Amino acid sequence: MKESGILFHAKHAYMPNLLGYCGPDENERINESLREGKTDDGLVHTLQEFEAAYPFLELIARSTGRKVFDYSVPEAYWIGNGLLDRVPGSEFYSFSHHELKGRDPRKVKEAFKSLDGVAPPHHSFYVMSTYATTVVPDGPNLSNESRRKVAQLVDNCRISWGEVRGVGKRELQVRIRPIEFRNGRLALAPPTVRRVQYNPEVKPFSSVRSGDVVSIHWNFACDVLTNRQSKNLAKYTAIDLGLVNRLLAGGTRRPEK
């Protein structure tokens, strides 16, 4: 039986909410629901109050004829799947221009023009493009220290993936490729082993083992991914990086295949 899309979404929204970055002050409600593997109207209401994530789910659902918490919708936003390819660029542009708080409409328009109107409503693209168009407008002229800080922020805030190499009580050792600045571009660095937190009380981490691939958000393992999901996350991350590097270069570079 497929997991609830509500719980899948909550797993990936949990850590930034705990850190106070996103959503209402309802982390214990989210945590309790994840531990018990149950959903209710209170959890749904809490997730609807995430000012960035929930409008993205609405956009994907509206564009593809799905319900907002159909499993495939939050999966598309956090991990990536074929639904992203069905969201018209014009819809995403209108959404970014009018609905995303904190975005300069002029910069949004310039960004979409430089990308020929092609951009996925994917969490990692949102994260990377936010820094590319607002935090780091100087692009290649950034100092080395600024580049390091931006790369670290992007790496923490995106959804990354890692292969489990060791399992502790509340920490996993994972083999991961972090984000770095390389030759003025954001890129995946060579693999390294890192420690991340996880909650063994949340399914499926009670049985996590070496060789599993997990999704990671703010140094916290969110879920164990299927082979299809890990391939999709790698695929859409590569697309996101290609597009964002065009923004950093002033729209002069084509996305990498």
Region spans (language model):
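Short nucleic-acid-contacting surface segments enriched for D/E, G, S/T with interspersed K/R
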Residues: 197-215
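Short peripheral tails and domain-boundary helices/loops at the edges of structured domains
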Residues: 229-257
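Short, basic/aromatic beta-hairpin or loop at an interaction surface
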Residues: 179-197
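Short, Lys/Arg- and Gly-enriched loop/turn segments at beta-strand edges
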Residues: 219-232
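Short, glycine-/Ser/Thr-/acidic-enriched flexible segments
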Residues: 169, 179, 221
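Structural detector for short beta-strands of small beta-barrel domains
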Residues: 152-174
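Short solvent-exposed strand/turn elements
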Residues: 175-183, 249-252
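N-terminal intrinsically disordered, low-complexity, charge/repeat-rich segments that act as generic
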Residues: 1-148
